[in-house]
């Protein structure tokens, strides 16, 4: 398997990090500090960073300021969402749940949902699309 990494950008000059390899280690606390130190965090109600990407799966670290809303949308795979800091409200067509630090949820592919930050929050979003 070929190792893949992202390229550095103007917004993330130190960005060259491994995105896919037989084994990828990630320091999530360092990534949290990084996205909260970026100008995008200061200018917007959120910031995010893909920390792993391979065929069939992606992991994204997302930080939301208090009261930030991710409007209703769908995902092209099964998702899991694990709150690392703060608290969010996760709303699907069938129910609305509060998800706090240390808790997680899972949702099937293609179901409409939205996310609202009750307070400043950080979570890991995993999107998996497996074809058996």
Where are these regions (language model features)?
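Glycine- and acidic-residue-biased ligand/ion/polar-headgroup-sensing regions
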Residues: 76-89, 93
């Amino acid at each position: 398997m070929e190792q893949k990494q992202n390229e550095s950008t103007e917004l993330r000059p130190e960005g060259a990090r491994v995105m896919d390899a037989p084994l990828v280690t990630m320091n999530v606390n360092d990534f949290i500090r990084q996205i909260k130190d970026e100008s995008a965090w200061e200018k917007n109600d959120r910031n995010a960073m893909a920390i792993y990407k391979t065929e069939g799966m992606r992991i994204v670290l997302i930080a939301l300021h208090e009261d930030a809303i991710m409007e209703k949308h769908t995902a092209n795979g099964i998702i899991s969402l694990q709150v690392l800091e703060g608290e969010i409200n996760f709303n699907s067509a069938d129910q609305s749940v509060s998800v706090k630090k240390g808790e997680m949820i899972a949702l099937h592919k293609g179901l409409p949902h939205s996310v609202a930050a009750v307070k400043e929050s950080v979570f890991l979003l995993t999107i998996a699309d497996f074809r058996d």
